[in-house]
């Protein structure tokens, strides 16, 4: 379809047996074959590893890979059956398309979309830098999969690296614009809030960043075995930013 920002290769359906050692998942395919897939997600994947859940995996023909299969998504049923993206390499590919197609009017006018540019006092790499007629805009992307009811939450664990990224974004103000783009990797969430239960310090820094002028872009996406489409911005409840 024309509105896909990303299309998956043909995927294989199956059922999750277990995730272990962070990067491995045993999966029973619908054919009955049991395979071990690479789990391209270093986080705890809170609420996303229930045995017997439906999953989709991709298969690589690269003979140099140790594992031919990659775990791409899992179906959760928190409020309704919903596919949630597992592969953390996908969000930046999708966001690049989002930016190149000018689908976020909040960002104003820009001519170039640059990726992985070094910046900041702590020598980080920004996911995207927009340059053009207006101020440059620094955009940090965070994949968001944890949800309580219909509220997306980030982070789902303590993230020292994420805290560093917030400090870096604050440091570019006011000479440039700065944004945190939360890639909500599931279609069932309509609101967003900091994951204070998992990382209170991150929540504190996020509120400081917003008060300083860093913009929040909680972007909702629909994940399906066919592809990914943009659903618009989630609502950020003011009460979640005023603690």
Swiss-Prot record:
It comes from the Bacteria. InterPro entries: SfsA, SfsA_C, SfsA_N. It holds the Pfam family SfsA_N. CDD domains: SfsA-like_bacterial. GO terms for molecular function: DNA binding. Belongs to the SfsA family. HAMAP family: SfsA (MF_00095). PANTHER family: SUGAR FERMENTATION STIMULATION PROTEIN A (PTHR30545:SF2). This is Sugar fermentation stimulation protein homolog. It comes from Acaryochloris marina (strain MBIC 11017). The lineage of its organism: Bacteria, Bacillati, Cyanobacteriota, Cyanophyceae, Acaryochloridales. The gene is sfsA.
